[in-house]
Amino acid sequence: YLERRLGVAPKVDLKLPIIPLGVDSSRYAADAEARARLRKHIGAAEEDFVILFLGRFTFHAKAHPVPMYLAAEGVARRLQDRKVHFVMAGQAPNETIYQSYLDSAAAYTEKASVHFVDGQDDDLVHASWQGADAFLSLSDNIQETFGLTPIEAMAAGLPAVVSDWDGYKDTIVDGETGFRIPTVTPSGGDGFEYAYLYQSGRDNYDRFVG
């Protein structure tokens, strides 16, 4: 980047190793009681298949839920002999957005059961990690620079299905530590108008990243 921007190849002797964010894996060790607690909370039997998403409930600054609802519904239609539950753990910034999540869940799922869990309830979040069978996060916003939840999913022993996007590319090795779903981005130049609105101060950062 510096060479392209300045026209001079920089010589940097200082090494800057990347030390990613980590988790205390002992907190995610198998906990049968917590697993049973989550399944009782959502009405899931032990043989049912539970998918977990954990993150902010915001369309523009985390992940649009509809692709995840469709994915859960697709699994439910394939697993004819097992009931599928999709647990959405997190919080919405306001009641209007939360209601839109509820409405879209009802509109896009029929066989899969969608459950919403308070992301500020530490005990229930812990139980969610333990009670799930798979982790799903199709993040699609430009501020997802790292993404800690796939690391937590791996610590909990859950197979992770994530979008092939931004920081998730660094934490999930496709086919080895999880599965990355291909994404599509606009062609170069398409974002000029949005960048201009942000740079000129007409849009704030929150709107820009959405």
Predicted regions span which residues?
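Short hydrophobic beta-strand element within catalytic cores of glycosyltransferases
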Residues: 159-162, 172, 179
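Short alpha-helical donor nucleotide-sugar binding micro-motif in glycosyltransferases
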Residues: 119-122, 127-132
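Short glycine/serine-rich donor-binding loops of glycosyltransferases
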Residues: 147-150, 168
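Helix-loop-beta element that forms the nucleotide-linked donor phosphate-binding surface
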Residues: 1-23
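Conserved catalytic-core segment of nucleotide-activated headgroup transferases in glycan assembly
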Residues: 7, 21-119
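A short acidic/histidine/glycine-rich donor-binding loop in glycosyltransferase catalytic cores
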Residues: 176-189, 196-203, 207
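Acidic donor-binding loop of glycosyltransferase active sites
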Residues: 130-145, 158
